[in-house]
Amino acid sequence: MACLLETPIRMSVLSEVTASSRHYVDRLFDPDPQKVLQGVIDMKNAVIGNNKQKANLIVLGAVPRLLYLLQQETSSTELKTECAVVLGSLAMGTENNVKSLLDCHIIPALLQGLLSPDLKFIEACLRCLRTIFTSPVTPEELLYTDATVIPHLMALLSRSRYTQEYICQIFSHCCKGPDHQTILFNHGAVQNIAHLLTSVSYKVRMQALKCFSVLAFENPQVSMTLVNVLVDGELLPQIFVKMLQRDKPIEMQLTSAKCLTYMCRAGAIRTDDNCIVLKTLPCLVRMCSKERLLEERVEGAETLAYLIEPDVELQRIASITDHLIAMLADYFKYPSSVSAITDIKRLDHDLKHAHELRQAAFKLYASLGANDEDIRKKIIDTENMMDRIVTGLSESSVKVRLAAVRCLHSLSRSVQQLRTSFQDHAVWKPLMKVLQNAPDEILVVASSMLCNLLLEFSPSKEPILESGAVELLCGLTQSENPALRVNGIWALMNMAFQAEQKIKADILRSLSTEQLFRLLSDSDLNVLMKTLGLLRNLLSTRPHIDKIMSTHGKQIMQAVTLILEGEHNIEVKEQTLCILANIADGTTAKELIMTNDDILQKIKYYMGHSHVKLQLAAMFCISNLVWNEEEGSQERQDKLRDMGIVDILHKLSQSPDSNLCDKAKTALQQYLA
């Protein structure tokens, strides 16, 4: 019986809940406009801070009716305004509420409302639009669908401090990427918003500042314009510097520092400018201190990482400012150990930000250690740092894993660290694990780091080889992603450098000649260059050259011919001629050149090329072919003389280029010996 009773009970509870809300909706349909207005006002009071009531009213169909009243010409301005206020309140509930409002096409209705002459109604519409556009479920594109909207919003900026605050907030949330920046810039965003930085309202100043930070991000055009904008006789960068002084609210300091950082990275402010070195950088380091809130520390560290990323001098200055390297170690101490039950809220907060803190610290360490050996050593010597980074490689959060890999990659540029810390912590093990199964963005950085670990002086090279790296890297060369193809082939190139014959044979077997030749015709120049580099490293030391050419000679000569005939740049042709020079150094392999008249004619052609690099590379081929201490040298010399090579050598021995001149003289001596 209990089962039978259960449903009616649930239904009665539901009907009770909806009944208490239904009368609010019913009153919206009253024929008396005064009663409708009072109904909307009562609804407004009922939903404030009550998410359950908001959800009920949405389910009962309040939104379409409110939108209808908002758009009716016969509705009084007061009624329209109250409708906009209620809709704004509903939007402040859950994300599902916002989705429901979007489904009812609330944005076009509110944008239409902005054409009203009544300021209070306009402000209510803007406040509601602000709430909807700042929700993560709202597509930013909805602001740009109608081309008349942005210019109209620009015109409304002068109406009141509320229109200024809401419109700037809408712009800063909906400006995502260069297309949006261009639209706002072309409609006069810089000129219309600049003077708001001196508004008496803190909220207006703050929202205007946020607008400039999103407009300037990675945008040279906007940044170059901002540098020269005057507001009340003061240049914008000077205003931003004033806003990042210690006596200003933290939010303002951080956002001003972002504006100056983005302008600097976009090339509008020099990295050695005082406003960067003496103001922006110290402000961002301050934001990383223990005194700041966790979210401020995250934002401070990430912005600082971005500011110093390309500049070694800023990296050095940051590394010795306020013990920054040691200060960042504290980012890994969250969540803190909780003793009292009263700290549960604190624990929840710490947990929420722990991932972000670790990610920010890794990013900043990566930027700090990008170039300077001493800074890298300081980072690695910081308490348990290598352990923390290695742990970061297996974090559940993709963003933390990516930041940890980037940090390791930055530190792996150090020969000293590759030989010591990286070996002590067997970094290659977790790295190989990361490479087995990770999103492309992580794979790109991890495989790039593997290239460093496979350099000939790295002690990690041997164990990496033994753990199946060849197959893994050959797999990467088949990726759709050009960056992964480059890194895969680059790592194989490093692996093949001065390697034993067995390793070279493993590479050729795993890669397959078909794939090797696919890579030699890759549209990506970097892939082609690294593949040629791999081939050059495979074809080094005579026994290896002869062995490889005895099995793959025909295909390799074919590939070389195609590249020398193709429309390739100087570097590609030079690398290809160097491969030929290596083949010419083989004992039996050189016969593959001597019996190929087409290749010999190409070498002759490049000896007379206008570019010295190509002449030199062709000369290496000739020197190796005519060297008289080797068997068959007389026949080779005779054949090359008949082709006119000796005449070219005489001509080159008079070359103004000392290298070329010396090489030609050395080759001629082989004929005289």
UniProtKB/Swiss-Prot annotation:
Keyword check for Nucleus: yes
Record protein name field: Armadillo repeat-containing protein 8
Domain of life: Eukaryota
Subunit structure: Identified in the CTLH complex that contains GID4, RANBP9 and/or RANBP10, MKLN1, MAEA, RMND5A (or alternatively its paralog RMND5B), GID8, ARMC8, WDR26 and YPEL5. Within this complex, MAEA, RMND5A (or alternatively its paralog RMND5B), GID8, WDR26, and RANBP9 and/or RANBP10 form the catalytic core, while GID4, MKLN1, ARMC8 and YPEL5 have ancillary roles.
Organism, scientific name: Bos taurus (Bovine)
SUPFAM superfamilies per record: ARM repeat (SSF48371)
SMART domains membership: ARM
The ARM repeat ranges on this chain: 51-92, 95-134, 138-176, 178-217, 224-265, 269-309, 313-352, 374-413, 416-455, 458-497, 501-540, 543-585, 588-627, 634-673
Function as written in the Swiss-Prot or TrEMBL entry: Component of the CTLH E3 ubiquitin-protein ligase complex that selectively accepts ubiquitin from UBE2H and mediates ubiquitination and subsequent proteasomal degradation of the transcription factor HBP1.
